[in-house]
């Protein structure tokens, strides 16, 4: 993961003032798994593009942006760009995404291991976590979950990632999103002391370190 890189444009198109850009390599993280995409800038000579979203279409990462200086032509788009991610925004996304992992672990501790993630939304400002349970949570249960999550945040748990075979990852106890299709190798995000992690999930998103 990096927040700045020199990049080349593979292809682009413009529609009503909005550029859709495919880069040869990209520091921008695309929206996926409920996590919103990165924003930032692309600068080459006198051309400046404000990237307001990054999405993934058929496994291709696409930056969507608008020209803020200069003009996008085949010539100006053919140069080398400096791609810069809005890193402060990304830090907030990291925090909220890691919080959803802590939240799921806390929910399973308080409500039971039947709790399964059904969806999520992670942005710099808010997070939403959808999960299955038999009934509405009581005020006492909500408070217990909140206390656990806050305690884990204050404990500054170590966070590490591993690339593992998907079957080995699931066998190790890593949580997977029900119905999600995974490749042969997956990224596992672990929070807590090695061997006794509080949270262990299959996840390709951004997290605190």
Q: Which residues does each predicted region cover?
A:
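A glycine- and charged-residue-rich anion-binding loop/surface
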Residues: 1-209
């Amino acid at each position: 993961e990096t927040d700045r890189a020199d990049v080349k444009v593979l292809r682009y198109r413009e529609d009503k003032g909005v550029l859709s850009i495919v880069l040869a390599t990209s520091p921008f993280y695309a929206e996926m798994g409920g996590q919103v995409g990165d924003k930032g800038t692309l600068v080459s000579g006198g051309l400046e593009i404000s990237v307001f979203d990054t999405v993934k279409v058929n496994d291709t990462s696409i930056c969507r942006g608008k020209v803020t200086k200069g003009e996008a032509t085949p010539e100006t788009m053919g140069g080398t760009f400096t791609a810069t991610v809005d890193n402060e925004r990304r830090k907030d996304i990291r925090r909220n995404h890691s919080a959803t992992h802590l939240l799921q672990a806390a929910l399973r501790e308080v409500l039971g291991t039947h709790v399964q993630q059904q969806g999520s939304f992670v942005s710099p400002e808010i997070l939403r976590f959808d999960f299955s349970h038999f009934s509405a949570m009581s005020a006492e249960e909500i408070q217990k979950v909140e206390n656990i999550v806050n305690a884990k945040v204050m404990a500054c748990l170590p966070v590490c990632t591993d690339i593992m075979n998907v079957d080995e990852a699931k066998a190790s106890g890593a949580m997977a999103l029900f119905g999600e299709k995974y490749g042969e190798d997956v990224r596992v995000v672990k929070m807590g002391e090695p061997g006794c992690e509080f949270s262990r999930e299959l996840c390709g998103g951004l997290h605190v370190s």
